[in-house]
Swiss-Prot record:
Pfam families: Alpha-amylase (PF00128), Alpha-amylase_C (PF02806), CBM_48 (PF02922), GlgB_N (PF22019). It comes from Gloeobacter violaceus (strain ATCC 29082 / PCC 7421). Transmembrane segments: none annotated. Monomer. This is 1,4-alpha-glucan branching enzyme GlgB. It is an enzyme of class 2 (transferase). Keywords: Carbohydrate metabolism, Glycogen biosynthesis, Glycogen metabolism, Glycosyltransferase, Transferase. CDD domains: AmyAc_Glg_BE (cd11322), E_set_GBE_prok_N (cd02855).
Length: 733
């Protein structure tokens, strides 16, 4: 037998410093071109026997105690190894006889330039068949690593057994096919850096992770689920969401409802499908928005500190069960939006931080790479492979889980280099400015690709500053989102409604100001989880007055919200006036529905959603100034606001009259453009909802009395802390 392996290569192998263990292990033709040599590295083995086509051959360990080899006269073909060690005897396939790869030269090229939109099909862990043998193909990007191994129960979490090879044609990808593994296998990567330091890391591209506090990745097959939402996807692709009603129910799955009889455990994805979907459908919401369900280690982050970007959290079940949840949403006519967090990630040792011993996913300079306020790290959007990781991730959720949209969290933190930083704590861009040019480019590319691949999808920005053109396409200089949270409306409106009605006349502009800029962007009016945490209290708790007035104020707020241009988002619990501040560790207080006023509030929101989705004037022209005009916004003393919403058909118009004080006006006159009978189609003060039941007996005939610049008018009864909605009855009706 010719000793064709240099001692330095053996030393590199046994010290986990070899970049290509295939150069030593597996079958090799001898230097003289005659016999073949088979080698295997089996630390701790006392005996190894090769079982091949020509029978059994005992392997020798002459050159190193753990390196076994034998000569065979011809190519060994398919063989197995019988290994004897302190744990007994086992029969295994040799991972190093499989030299195939799922990576092509094109894959490496596209990944290096940041344009591999399905890189998740190549990196990570994938069940595969090589040479007729089933197993799992592993691949990981770690360009600065000296050595990478796969760890798991299958090798007693010993990094010496399954060392990966560095792919020559890539930018630092390591790969290995391990036979006889399959779905459900728990694994990690052991990464040795240039200084010899060893890190155990979860797989950034894993499709499933262990339930915290464990941190292993789990092999999952995403091709097993059979979808039944084809019709929904076809309709979505042909739709324009800006012209459709969007009534979004924002949910934190871990605290919407729990099972107190079983240790207050979470509901599973299957149980949530059984309970949450019918509940949302009954209330008339069109979409569910999920606070981040991407895998995260800390419950208290609500999901906003993500480590497993490609894995739905194991808190509620497995990937297939989450697919079924989305599928059942679609079959019930409900869309699914995911909160997505590309702005930052946590520092947990098993995660992305210092992944290969260097600042791989984050900036090396803490002035660019760390959010001091949040204690998290910032992605390096200027690195192609990092940008590819994030963009492919967003596309992955649309492609593999059929989601309908994403809400991108903390966009402002991405756009500004000096976000939450003092002088000297940030680095200017190449022009000396504070704009993060790489993040801007990333967001534009992200949105262009989402709408290229998934027409009719939603990409919503949570952007809290006055950054221009957030919802305009990149070719016009915009960021490319199609919707943005209306943070200004939320701030001003809540400030107004927190004020005692006696003093609201002094905050009149809080209601009118948002209209001056509401058509500069495509907005979502969001009363979100952010408004009911951190000592802010509940939404009903913000309302002034006695018990009756609190509920009346909240009904008036919601009615005004649904009348104001923009799509709608309500956080869970608001629909029945949840009494206490949201606590992510507890279920909502569902027992409140035993009380009439909370049950009536829920009934009110159900009716409001029916009004909204049934009246095109409330959604068709949300982003067009032609869809709104003030009739009267100057009644400061009475805190009354009157406006009209119009649809694509100008004759489709609704008149809103909102009284934000507890004063009842039995003879209040408002101008209308057209003569005829104006039907009262909604009254927030109806006794059905717990109001005082002041109204107009179903409607009013207009009078030839000009007011508010309109040729006709209505003399109506205006209820206290109430909003009325009128629709002119057409002649043929």
């Amino acid at each position: 037998m010719n000793p064709t392996v240099e001692l330095r290569d053996i030393e590199a192998l046994v010290t986990n410093l070899h970049a290509d263990p295939f150069a030593i292990l597996g079958p090799h033709r001898a230097e003289d071109g005659g016999a073949w040599v088979v080698r295997t590295y089996q630390p701790g083995a006392s005996r190894v026997v090769l079982l091949g086509e020509s029978g059994e051959l005992a392997m020798e360990n002459r050159r190193h105690p753990d390196l076994f080899e034998c000569a065979v006269p011809t190519a060994p073909g398919a063989y197995r190894l019988r290994v004897e060690d302190a744990w007994g005897e086992r029969l295994i396939e040799d991972a190093y006889r499989f030299r195939g790869s799922l990576l092509s030269d094109l894959d490496g090229h596209l990944f290096a330039e940041g344009n591999h939109h399905r890189i998740y099909e190549k990196l990570g862990a994938h069940p595969a068949v090589f040479e007729g043998v089933a197993g799992v193909y592993f691949a990981v990007w770690a360009p600065s690593a000296r050595n990478v191994s796969v760890l798991g129960d299958f090798n007693r979490w010993d990094g010496r057994f399954h060392q990966m090879r560095r792919v020559e044609r890539s930018t630092g990808i390591w790969e290995l096919f391990i036979p006889e593994l399959g779905e459900g296998t728990v694994y990690k990567f052991e990464i040795k850096n240039g200084f010899g330091h060893i890190y155990e890391k979860s797989d950034p591209y894993a499709f499933q992770q262990e339930l915290r506090p464990k941190s292993g990745s789990v092999v999952a097959d995403l091709d097993r689920y059979s979808w039944n939402d084809g019709e929904w996807l076809k309709r979505r692709a042909l739709s324009n969401p800006l012209k459709q009603p969007l009534a979004i129910y924002e949910v934190h799955l871990g605290s919407w409802m729990r099972v107190p009889e079983e240790g207050d455990r979470f509901l599973s994805y299957t149980e949530l499908a059984d309970k949450l979907i019918p509940y949302v459908k009954d209330l008339g919401f069109t979409h569910i928005e999920l606070l981040p369900i991407l895998e995260h280690p800390f419950d208290g982050s609500w999901g906003y500190q993500v480590l497993g970007y490609y894995a739905p959290t194991s808190r509620f079940g497995n990937p297939t069960e989450f697919m079924a949840f989305v599928d059942r949403c679609h079959q019930s006519g409900i869309g699914v939006i995911l909160d997505w967090v590309p702005a930052h990630f946590p520092k947990d040792g098993h995660g992305l931080a210092l992944f290969d011993g260097t600042h791989l996913y984050e900036h090396a300079d803490s002035r660019q790479g760390e959010h001091k306020e949040w204690g998290t790290l910032v992605f390096n959007y200027g690195r192609n492979e990092v940008r590819n990781f994030l963009i492919a991730n967003a596309l992955f959720w649309f492609e593999r889980y059929h989601i309908d949209g994403i809400r991108v969290d903390a966009v402002a933190a991405m756009l500004y280099l000096d976000y939450s930083r003092h002088d000297g704590e940030w680095v200017a861009n190449r022009y000396g400015g504070r704009e993060n040019l790489e993040a801007i480019g990333f967001l534009r590319q992200l949105n262009e690709l989402i709408f290229l691949y998934y027409p009719g999808a939603l990409s919503i920005a949570e952007e809290s500053t006055a950054w221009p053109l957030v919802t305009r396409p990149p070719y016009l200089g915009g960021l490319g989102f199609n919707l943005k949270w209306h943070m200004g409306w939320m701030h001003d409106t809540l400030a107004y409604f927190r004020t005692d009605p006696l003093f609201r006349r002094y905050r009149h502009n809080d209601i009118t100001f948002s209209i001056t800029y509401t058509f500069y962007e495509n907005f979502v009016l969001a009363l979100s989880h952010d408004e009911v945490v951190h000592m802010k209290g509940s939404i009903i708790g913000k309302m002034p007055g006695d018990g009756w007035q609190k509920f009346a104020n909240l009904r008036a707020l919601f009615t005004f919200m649904y009348g104001h241009p923009g799509k709608k988002t309500l956080f869970m619990g608001m629909e029945f006036a949840h009494g206490r501040e949201w606590n992510a560790y507890q279920s909502l207080d569902w027992h409140l529905l035993d009380y009439p006023q909370h049950r009536q509030m829920q009934q009110f929101v159900r009716a409001l959603n029916r009004l909204y989705t049934g009246q095109p004037a409330l959604y068709e022209e949300d982003c067009n100034p032609a869809g709104f005009f003030w009739v009267d916004c100057h009644d400061v003393l009475n805190s009354v606001f009157t406006f009209v919403r119009r649809g694509k058909d100008p004759s489709e118009q609704l008149l809103f009259v909102c009284n934000f004080t507890p004063t009842y006006h039995p003879h209040y006159r408002v101008g209308v453009l057209e003569t005829g009978f104006w039907q009262e189609i909604f009254n927030s003060d109806s006794g059905i909802y717990g109001g005082s039941n002041k109204g107009n007996l179903g409607g009013l005939w207009s009078e030839n009395w000009a007011i508010h610049g309109q040729p006709y008018s209505l003399g109506l009864q205006l209820p206290p802390l109430g909003c009325l909605v009128f629709k002119r009855r057409k002649e043929q009706d």
